[in-house]
Amino acid sequence: MRNMSFMITPDQIRAKTKTVTRRMGWKNLKPGTLLQPVVKGQGLKKGEQVEKIGGPIRVLSVDRVILNQITPQDVYREGFPQMTQREFVTMFKKSHRGCRAGSAVNRIQFEYAEEA
């Protein structure tokens, strides 16, 4: 099972309030795939270990979407109910080098596998 990092949203994953994630990569991901959420998957210092966040998640869908076309509902599903669409896009761009508001990203919808 592959790991997927949720470094920005570990609390939302722990609380199971996040059901959608946008990624620059992961374009070959298929519905039904099980993934293990982790806090950080890359850039670990010597001696650091991957920290799992709960149990696995199951991918429900993967769609190519334009970042700045995010809906208020998806901002909520991303785990940021307090943010506006513009605030989410700004935050996403800052955390993903080279990403622009009009960039195509992968929208991954998932469920928590132990509840499925």
Predicted regions and their residues:
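Structured alpha/beta reader/binder surfaces that contact nucleic acids or chromatin modification marks
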Residues: 1-116
